[in-house]
């Protein structure tokens, strides 16, 4: 599976975990078997879970007149994934992480999601 597809699947898993009180393995079981064992997909999901408090703090310090809890689950999940890539995955250039996050926002969010995600990420990397 290519990284773009893995990001989409990781988003879906993390989104489910964010909106439902569900266990990780229960959500992972909903994926096809080959997807379940994709190394990049699992590294995104497990990385966001492991570093969630640090990632959320990073996001929170760059929000104006917002709290992380007020951000819609779609945008919050996408931001968490992008920040994980920027902070913890060295072989992905920042601009790739940002572009992929914007693409995810266009795919899964509304028409303003891409602008919001881009704005927050631009502040974080500045």
From Swiss-Prot:
The keyword Transcription regulation applies. It holds the Pfam family NusB. One of its GO terms (cellular component) is cytosol. SUPFAM superfamilies: NusB-like. Keywords: RNA-binding, Transcription, Transcription antitermination, Transcription regulation. Transmembrane segments: none annotated. Belongs to the NusB family. Involved in transcription antitermination. Required for transcription of ribosomal RNA (rRNA) genes. Binds specifically to the boxA antiterminator sequence of the ribosomal RNA (rrn) operons. PANTHER family: ANTITERMINATION NUSB DOMAIN-CONTAINING PROTEIN, N UTILIZATION SUBSTANCE PROTEIN B-RELATED. NCBIfam families: nusB, PRK00202.1-1. This is Transcription antitermination protein NusB.
């Amino acid at each position: 599976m290519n990284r773009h597809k893995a990001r989409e699947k990781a988003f879906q898993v993390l989104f489910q975990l964010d909106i439902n009180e569900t266990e990780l393995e229960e959500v992972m079981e909903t994926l096809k078997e080959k997807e379940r064992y994709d190394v990049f997909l699992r590294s995104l999901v497990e990385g966001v879970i492991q570093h969630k408090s640090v990632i959320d703090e990073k996001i929170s310090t760059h929000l104006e007149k917002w709290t992380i809890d007020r951000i819609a689950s779609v945008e919050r999940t996408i931001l968490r994934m992008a920040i994980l890539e920027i902070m913890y995955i060295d072989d992905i250039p920042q601009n790739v992480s940002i572009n992929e996050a914007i693409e995810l926002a266009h795919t899964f969010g509304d028409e303003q999601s891409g602008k919001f995600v881009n704005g927050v990420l631009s502040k974080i990397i500045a």
